[in-house]
Regions:
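Feature captures the FAD/FMN-dependent oxidoreductase FAD-binding
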Residues: 149, 154-158, 206-255, 370-385, ...
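Glycine-rich Rossmann-fold phosphate-binding loop(s) that bind the pyrophosphate
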Residues: 158-162, 299-301, 462
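A conserved FAD-binding loop/helix module that cradles the flavin
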Residues: 304-307, 314, 460-491
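C-terminal catalytic lobe of FAD-dependent flavoproteins
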Residues: 12-37, 42-45, 365-367, 373, ...
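Glycine-rich dinucleotide-binding loop and its adjacent helix/turn
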Residues: 131-149, 207-227, 250-314, 437-448, ...
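Ferredoxin-type iron-sulfur electron-transfer modules in oxidoreductases and energy-metabolism complexes
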Residues: 24-38, 64-65, 69-104, 108, ...
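Beta1-alpha1 glycine-rich phosphate/pyrophosphate-binding loop at the start
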Residues: 8-32, 41-44, 68-82, 91-92, ...
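FAD-site-proximal beta/loop scaffold in flavoenzymes
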Residues: 261-292, 392-467
């Protein structure tokens, strides 16, 4: 521990965000990183705990606590305090293939488990990680390192999201020949088209993919396995196949008038914006536009927040975000102690922007849609909303939301974005390979394994565990790589 009093000597200092007025004019990332000197002070705040929950990655109660990748957080915090940035990068890359992604989009499970955060402000772990990886690129440390020996084994990975990329990176470094198939026109999966550019600029993805290509990973875009390419062909040509297709099947809602024109899934809205932004700077009008419209977002999660922020950048007339459940408390309750993940209300960037642009929080709690209203041409023009109240089922003890009779009211709306989560992977891929799925429509495997019921076919990521975080997808990719390597070589050092 380089500075035992660091957490007392220095206050937490976060990267400064651009003003709302400035940042909504474009789709760029909007934080100014701390200087190296200031970041080193933040590293000094780490207490080097005897039991570092930040990196523990463990189940506590009904919640997960700490980093799923078991990042060596106290070690690289201490190293950056000492100015040893290269050594910090070397420790970081042992456990995390893509700190350039997680330092931008991870909700920082580590910080919520930080001991400093139990009675004060947590260490700026995510910002420290960002500083380490960006310094590595600036100093030429993050460069291609192709394996010196090849095993002669060939592996096909279907899907180039975070789990597929992590598996590809691990297995390629082991010396296997890896080909990644992606049905979209660009590599990245969820990272490319599911997360807006202002949270993760796509040049950051391309930068890492270029390194992976130099190291020998082959990428084939615009190839829809299960349709363009038969599963049997891949099974015949490759020693192992890993399915990393994500949980891309959006959850729909059953509401009267759902067929109205102007109702879209959030993922389609976000993808259309990012693709048009990258293709032509949003100049050809091919994307789903919120400009001048009253927008309603159904769903209160991260994707819903991204829809709010994107709609504001389009120039929406108004934005309303519906959440069925009651508002969470502002602080931890007695049954949600540290170091559990805090079940508290948070206001994310999109909601912050809506508050400043429209003068009020876009979120409406304990409310849902009862009916959509169309004009005589089938275009959406409004919705009937209804308020809800929580009721506990006496038999199961579960909380359900019931409509409050007579609480209906109408709102004007021309664009609805459904951000109600996902229901597993699209079935044509699983059917093509003949793999079994479970009741949640995730690919079925034995507990603790990534092997499917089909010989030589494995799975990882959201397709395996269900809708989750990027950091969990990376963990899944690393785990499946270890299992595949063991099956090919008879032992593994991954």
């Amino acid at each position: 521990m380089g500075k035992p009093t660091g957490f007392m000597d220095y206050n937490r200092e976060d990267a400064e965000a651009f003003s709302v007025k400035e940042r909504i004019q474009n789709y760029n990332e909007f934080h100014t990183p701390l200087s190296k000197k200031d970041q080193e002070k933040q590293g000094a705040r780490c207490m080097e705990c005897g039991v570092p929950f930040c990196q523990a990655g463990m189940q506590i109660g009904n919640a997960f606590s700490g980093c799923p990748l078991n990042n060596l957080i106290p070690e690289w915090n201490d190293l950056i305090f000492k100015g040893c940035w290269e050594q910090a990068y070397n420790r970081l890359k042992i456990t995390n293939n893509f700190p350039e992604f997680t330092s931008r989009v991870c909700p920082a499970l580590c910080e919520k488990a930080c001991t400093c955060g139990a009675n004060g402000d947590a260490i700026t772990v995510r910002a420290n990680e960002y500083g380490i990886i960006e310094n590595a690129y600036e100093q030429g440390l993050a460069e291609a390192n192709p394996p010196k020996v090849r095993t002669g084994k060939k592996i096909a990975i279907i899907g180039s999201g975070p789990s597929g990329l992590a598996a590809a990176d691990q297995l390629n470094q082991r010396g296997h020949s890896v080909t990644v198939f992606e049905r979209s026109d660009r590599v990245g999966g969820l990272l490319m088209y599911g997360i807006p550019n202002m949270k993760l600029e796509k040049e950051v993805i391309d930068r890492k993919i270029s390194i992976m290509k130099e190291e020998g990973v082959e990428f084939k875009t615009g190839v829809n396995v299960g349709k363009d390419v038969k599963a049997k062909k891949l099974l015949d040509e490759y020693d192992r196949v890993i399915l990393c297709c994500g949980a891309s099947n959006p959850r729909d809602i059953k509401v009267k008038g759902r067929e109205a024109k102007g109702i879209y899934f959030a993922v389609d809205f976000l993808k259309s914006t990012t693709k048009a932004l990258l293709d032509n700077g949003l100049k050809d009008g091919t994307y789903i536009s919120a400009k001048g419209k009253n927008v309603m977002v159904i769903g209160g999660g991260d994707t819903g927040n991204d829809c709010v922020g994107t709609s504001i950048r389009h120039g929406a007339k108004s934005v309303l975000q519906l959440e069925m459940m009651p508002k969470l408390p502002d602080k931890r309750t007695a049954d949600n102690p540290w170091p559990q993940w805090p079940r508290v209300c948070k206001t994310d960037y999109g909601q912050e922007e809506a508050i400043e642009v429209f003068g009020h929080d876009p979120r409406v709690y304990q409310t849902t849609v009862k009916e959509f209203i169309s004009d005589d041409k089938g275009n959406l023009k409004g919705a009937v909303l209804v308020k809800l109240k929580p009721e506990k089922d006496e038999k199961t003890g579960r909380l359900t939301m019931k409509e409050i009779e007579g609480s209906e009211y109408n709102v004007d709306v021309e664009l609805v974005l459904i951000a109600a989560g996902f229901l597993g992977s699209e079935s044509y891929v699983t059917k093509a390979f003949g793999v079994e799925v479970n009741a949640r429509t995730n690919v079925a495997t034995a507990e603790g394994s990534h092997a499917t019921n089909v010989k030589n076919v494995f799975t990882a990521g959201d397709m395996h565990r269900g809708q989750s975080l990027v950091v969990w997808a990376i963990r899944e990719g690393r785990d499946v790589a270890k299992e595949v390597d063991l099956s090919l070589i008879g032992y593994t050092n991954l």
